[in-house]
């Protein structure tokens, strides 16, 4: 059975909330304006690192994952 995640016109705040529940991580977003951005996409049974790499490229941010706390900083 596939574990597909589908997002249709969801705010990044909702996307991060979903990822938090699914992967047991916490998001620390330094620039809160990013949370209002909209995302549409599908992830097919991917791990949190793969998903974050896609989001990083799409939204031009850097992130670090330390002990389940993912800190996100927008690139200047």
What are these regions (language model features)?
Residues 1-76:
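A residue-level detector for the "anchor" residue at the start of short, highly conserved motifs
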